[in-house]
Amino acid sequence: MKFEVRGAFKTLEGWQKFTKVVEANNERYALEKVYSLIGSNHKVKRNLIKIEEVKQA
């Protein structure tokens, strides 16, 4: 299933909003995937990533 995850992560300039569509078996795995992607691409720790909404795409 595909999930659309919306949220924001902290940068030096402030909070940067994002929307990611990920393939996952359930909502929990979708969240883990987004934390992993944002963290690796932007060098942001999980406590600086705020998830606002997760819905099935």
Curated annotation (Swiss-Prot):
It comes from the Archaea. GO terms for biological process: translation. Keywords: Ribonucleoprotein, Ribosomal protein, RNA-binding, rRNA-binding. GO terms for molecular function: large ribosomal subunit rRNA binding; structural constituent of ribosome. The keyword Disulfide bond does not apply. The keyword Coiled coil does not apply. It holds the Pfam family Ribosomal_L18A. One of its GO terms (cellular component) is ribosome. InterPro entries: Ribosomal_eL20, Ribosomal_eL20_dom. Belongs to the eukaryotic ribosomal protein eL20 family. Part of the 50S ribosomal subunit. Binds 23S rRNA. This is Large ribosomal subunit protein eL20. It comes from Archaeoglobus fulgidus (strain ATCC 49558 / DSM 4304 / JCM 9628 / NBRC 100126 / VC-16).
